[in-house]
């Protein structure tokens, strides 16, 4: 793609999720990059926080690079951007003065990053979860990703919920915590039964996701951890199956739980996997470059 003109061009990609947000600005010709990180940016969980995080990261990149908004094509991929009302509201706040702007779901940016824009079935396992396919004719489709309250099976947050449910059942059966998983959980939240119940009622998706690693760490030595993780694996395999459907597509796992989850998958599922060529941030930048190319083509 040739973008040479008298006005330097930049692309800006934003990847925002339930735990962290990363933004990258890149000069089209020199390929120089600037990258910054911040907190959560999920429209599902907290609109105001998502807006504040994105605004802050964008301003940081403008300061670091000296670029102006009118020189930039930006694609912002956020968890929860499927909510049309919230998306329109946020786009109205963020899009002003940019050369061109697109707000989409983090599932879309993950999908295009997973296999560098080539056909693929992408499964994102982070604080939340979602599946998506990109076929040879360019058609894309999403599966799952309904958010923590009614979906997100296979995610870090839902694995955390499985841990809590298991330990609460243990308390009911024994009137005390006996498993290694339960004891590790109490150590992590710095309290016993009462604190556990209080924590459970107040916890956000990111909090539930923060305890998910315990199931992996204790899998080999704790039956309760093994039971919980086995259910998580079933949920992930179901999401993979639903996402692929009738498409014979390679599968890419992305997100913070992708690598920890892989060793426990069924061998038949493992044969479907290929290594990712990129991530959601790469996908956002890929889409931003496409957006800039389209804008330039329309204006020539």
State where each predicted segment sits.
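Phosphate-binding/catalytic loop of phosphoryl-transfer enzymes
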Residues: 81-177
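ATP-binding/phosphotransfer module of carbohydrate and carboxylate kinases, centering on a glycine-rich
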Residues: 1-72, 93, 113-121, 164-300
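N-terminal short leaders/motifs
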Residues: 45, 79-86, 229
């Amino acid at each position: 793609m040739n973008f040479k003109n008298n006005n330097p061009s930049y692309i800006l990609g934003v990847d925002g999720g339930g735990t962290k947000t990363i933004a990258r600005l890149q000069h089209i010709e020199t390929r120089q990059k600037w990258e910054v990180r911040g907190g959560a940016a999920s429209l599902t969980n907290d609109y105001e926080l998502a807006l504040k995080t994105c605004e802050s990261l964008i301003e940081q990149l403008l300061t670091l690079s000296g670029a102006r908004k009118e020189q930039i094509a930006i694609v912002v991929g956020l968890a929860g951007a499927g909510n049309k009302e919230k998306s329109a509201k946020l786009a109205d706040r963020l899009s002003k003065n940019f050369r061109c702007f697109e707000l989409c779901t983090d599932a879309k940016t993950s999908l295009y990053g997973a296999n560098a824009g080539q056909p693929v079935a992408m499964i994102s396992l982070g604080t939340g979860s979602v599946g998506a396919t990109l076929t040879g004719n360019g058609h894309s489709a999403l599966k799952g990703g309904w958010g923590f309250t009614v979906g997100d099976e296979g995610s870090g947050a839902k694995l955390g919920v499985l841990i809590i449910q298991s330990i609460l059942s243990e308390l009911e059966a024994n009137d005390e915590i006996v498993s290694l998983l339960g004891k590790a959980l109490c150590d992590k939240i710095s309290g016993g039964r009462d604190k556990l119940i209080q924590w459970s009622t107040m916890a956000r998706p990111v909090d539930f996701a923060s305890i998910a690693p315990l199931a992996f760490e204790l899998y080999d030595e704790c039956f309760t951890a093994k039971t919980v993780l086995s259910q998580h694996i079933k949920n992930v395999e179901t999401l993979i199956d639903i996402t692929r459907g009738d498409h014979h597509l390679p599968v890419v796992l992305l997100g913070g739980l992708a690598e920890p989850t892989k060793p426990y998958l069924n061998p038949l599922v493992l044969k479907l996997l290929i290594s990712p060529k990129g991530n959601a941030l790469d996908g956002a930048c890929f889409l931003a470059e496409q957006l800039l190319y389209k804008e330039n083509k329309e204006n020539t």
